[in-house]
Amino acid sequence: MKAVFFDLDDTLLWDEKSVRTTFAETCLQAEKKYGLAPEEFEAAVREAARELYMSYETYPYTVMIGINPFEGLWSNFSEPISEGFQKLNKIVPEYRRNAWTNGLKALGIDDPAYGEYLGEFFAAERRKRPFVYDETFAVLDQLKGKYELLLLTNGDPSLQKEKLAGVPELAPYFNEIVISGAFGKGKPDVSIFEHCLKLMNIEKDDAIMVGDNLNTDILGASRAGIKTVWINRTDKKNETDVKPDYIISSLHDLFPILEK
């Protein structure tokens, strides 16, 4: 084994915690102003965001690149590298405003100005909340020098770069960083994995992919003939047809696999 490919969100960075705590803080503002139950309001906003996101002409593009509705609640899509990102950049202020406004409306509150305020509050608050898993740096320290390391992440290039800038120690570990929005297709498309192999100048048998998402990280790498490690920290049940080669609950569990 010569190279380890890592996913970013919820593999090295604890993105779920960032989103969860940002929603909690933002919904607390609405509880203070309107007495809304935070959990109920969050559910309403998440549903409103999903519906809106799917209604835009850019939706198929975001699916291809691998950008979810909640990334759109704080991304500015500020790199005009394609027509898709140019459109997203124009749409996103309205999307943010309406997602929160429609969430309020679902609970009987008609206040577009406050919806806009919450949209901006959420985006600013999310930027303050980069979380890294406890074991991330210890594991990367042990791997660096022994293996070539590549970071493969789906998303908007401007946003993924911003996440990395929020944890500046992370990027220097990697020989290459590949972001789906810059490449033009996202995981699980085989082409992005083949691109990574070419970048690293290695064969598929010399790499292993580590990620938390069965339908993107594991499926795509498997299709490309790359060995896969599903990191499943919360003991989720695999309800897909995707079969990872290995399953771990901590990044520390990688070492016995790599030493085989």
Curated annotation (Swiss-Prot):
Pathway(s) where this gene product acts: Amino-acid biosynthesis; L-serine biosynthesis; L-serine from 3-phospho-D-glycerate: step 3/3
Source organism per UniProt: Bacillus subtilis (strain 168)
Record carries keyword Magnesium: yes
Gene that this sequence comes from: serB
Lineage: Bacteria, Bacillati, Bacillota, Bacilli, Bacillales
Effect of deleting the gene: Cells lacking this gene cannot grow in minimal medium, in contrast to wild type. ysaA, serA, and serC deletion mutants have virtually identical profiles when observed across all the conditions studied, likely placing YsaA in the serine biosynthesis pathway. The defect is complemented by glycine, or a combination of serine and other amino acids such as glutamine or glutamate. The inability of serine alone to rescue the growth defect of the deletion mutant is due to serine toxicity.
Alphabetically ordered keywords of this record: Amino-acid biosynthesis, Cobalt, Hydrolase, Magnesium, Serine biosynthesis
Name this polypeptide is given: Phosphoserine phosphatase
Any one biological process term the GO annotation gives: L-serine biosynthetic process
InterPro entries found in the cross-reference section: HAD-like_hydrolase, HAD-like_sf, HAD-SF_hydro_IA, HAD_sf, PGP-like_dom2, PSP_YsaA
Function summary: Catalyzes the last step of the phosphorylated serine biosynthetic pathway, i.e. dephosphorylation of O-phospho-L-serine to form L-serine. To a lesser extent, is also able to dephosphorylate phosphothreonine, phosphoethanolamine, and histidinol phosphate in vitro.
EC identifiers of the protein: 3.1.3.3
Obligatory cofactor(s): Mg(2+); Co(2+)
